[in-house]
């Protein structure tokens, strides 16, 4: 049989990570923008933290910079930005902020077929360097194809200013790759889903790097931001190799999205994934205790009551999480988990 397999992979061309690297935005935009018009998508706080400097640097070099300050990463916000930017003949889109602002920017860039540059202000999750965008509608998160960053500028001197909680959540999101890859292997074995061993290996490597150095992740340490961010970048690259989010999104992310759909709003994405990873590793009959201990060391609680979440919400989220993306097979199976089984798993792992 004639070999016909084909795949396209897009990777960041320019990656700057470290202390005071923000000024390299001029180099990255200069090499990749199609003209002298740039769009910045940011938020009120993150614009003051880094976006204004990006604006001023590019303006100094003759760029016409158009700034859009956005709220939550949902379809209404995306549609507003896309409508308001219709008349701008932009040559590049720059996302400055946390995960939500960067997701909006990468989706805008994808829809407009423009180069995209990611400038994260917090190492809160692996979306800062992946080609996937998470957008919400009616409280439910949907994973959309977005633009893979042509450039990433992760200035640790800026990112260290974010609350430690965001750093811990970013580390947890990378560690969650372990359960995601186990789900991917399961889907490959039972459902014949296409599997990339190289993408899986990179994803697992980034998770193990964080896990093995968990005690080095500390508050107010710029080196800790460096450690987590470089593995976030590796995790995003794994998704680019796979051509989908499988290397970093499995049952633990379905559980997190089920919590979001239930109206849980006072948890960060990485914190929800931490909770989901522990339960997923338990269901896979893996060493969930080691993962839970790592989250304890990060200062992340996986007890739902610590976030003011009622037990029934968590139980229902676990039972129905499989339905969030029914086409994505995981350890959660294809039908609702029994009530008693969900309670047993959640109680044994200490989540409820």
From Swiss-Prot:
InterPro entries the record matches: G1P_dehydrogenase_arc, G1PDH, Glycerol_DH
Pfam families: Fe-ADH_2
Residues bound to NAD(+): 99-103, 121-124, 130
Entry's Gene Ontology BP terms: glycerophospholipid metabolic process; phospholipid biosynthetic process
Pathway: Membrane lipid metabolism; glycerophospholipid metabolism
Residues annotated to bind Zn(2+): 173, 253, 269
UniProt-listed Enzyme Commission number(s): 1.1.1.261
Positions bound to substrate: 126, 173, 257
Leading EC class: oxidoreductase
Catalytic activity as recorded in UniProt: sn-glycerol 1-phosphate + NAD(+) = dihydroxyacetone phosphate + NADH + H(+); sn-glycerol 1-phosphate + NADP(+) = dihydroxyacetone phosphate + NADPH + H(+)
Keyword annotations from UniProtKB, A to Z: Cytoplasm, Lipid biosynthesis, Lipid metabolism, Metal-binding, NAD, NADP, Oxidoreductase, Phospholipid biosynthesis, Phospholipid metabolism, Zinc
Cleavable signal peptide: none
GO function terms (MF aspect): glycerol-1-phosphate dehydrogenase (NAD+) activity; glycerol-1-phosphate dehydrogenase (NADP+) activity; metal ion binding
Note on cofactor: Binds 1 zinc ion per subunit.
Superkingdom of this protein's organism: Archaea
Intracellular or extracellular location(s): Cytoplasm
Cofactor: Zn(2+)
Gene Ontology CC terms: cytoplasm
Purpose: Catalyzes the NAD(P)H-dependent reduction of dihydroxyacetonephosphate (DHAP or glycerone phosphate) to glycerol 1-phosphate (G1P). The G1P thus generated is used as the glycerophosphate backbone of phospholipids in the cellular membranes of Archaea.
Family of the protein in this entry: Belongs to the glycerol-1-phosphate dehydrogenase family.
Protein name listed in UniProt: Glycerol-1-phosphate dehydrogenase [NAD(P)+]
Organism lineage string: Archaea, Methanobacteriati, Thermoplasmatota, Thermoplasmata, Thermoplasmatales
């Amino acid at each position: 049989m004639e070999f016909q397999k084909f795949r396209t992979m897009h990777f960041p061309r320019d990656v700057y990570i470290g202390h005071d690297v923000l000024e390299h935005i001029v180099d990255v935009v200069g090499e990749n923008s199609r003209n002298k018009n740039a769009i910045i998508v940011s938020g009120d706080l993150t614009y003051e933290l880094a976006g204004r400097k990006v604006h001023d640097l590019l303006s100094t070099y003759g760029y016409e910079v158009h700034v859009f300050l956005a709220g939550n990463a949902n379809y209404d916000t995306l549609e507003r930005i896309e409508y308001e930017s219709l008349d701008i003949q932009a040559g590049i889109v720059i996302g400055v902020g946390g995960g939500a602002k960067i997701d909006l920017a990468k989706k805008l860039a994808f829809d407009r077929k423009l180069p995209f540059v990611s400038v994260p202000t917090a190492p809160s999750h692996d979306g800062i360097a992946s080609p996937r965008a998470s957008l919400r509608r009616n409280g439910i998160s949907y994973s959309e194809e977005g633009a893979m960053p042509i450039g990433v500028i992760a200035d640790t001197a800026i990112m260290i200013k974010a609350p430690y909680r965001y750093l811990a959540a970013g580390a947890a999101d990378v560690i969650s790759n372990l359960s995601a890859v186990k789900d991917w292997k399961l889907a490959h074995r039972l459902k014949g889903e296409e599997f990339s061993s190289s993408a899986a290996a990179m994803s697992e490597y980034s998770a193990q790097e964080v896990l093995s150095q968990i005690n080095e992740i500390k508050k107010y340490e710029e080196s800790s931001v460096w450690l987590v961010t470089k593995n976030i970048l590796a995790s995003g690259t794994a998704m680019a190799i796979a051509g989908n989010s499988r290397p970093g999104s499995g049952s633990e992310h379905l559980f997190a999205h089920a919590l979001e759909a239930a109206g849980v709003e006072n948890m960060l994405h990485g914190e929800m994934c931490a909770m989901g990873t522990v339960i997923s590793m338990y269901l896979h009959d893996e060493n969930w205790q080691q993962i839970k201990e790592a989250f304890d060391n990060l200062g992340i609680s996986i007890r739902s009551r610590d976030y003011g979440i009622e037990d029934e919400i968590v139980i229902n989220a676990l039972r129905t999480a499989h339905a969030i993306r029914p086409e994505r097979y995981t350890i959660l199976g294809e039908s609702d988990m029994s009530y008693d089984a969900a309670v047993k798993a959640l109680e044994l792992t200490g989540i409820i």
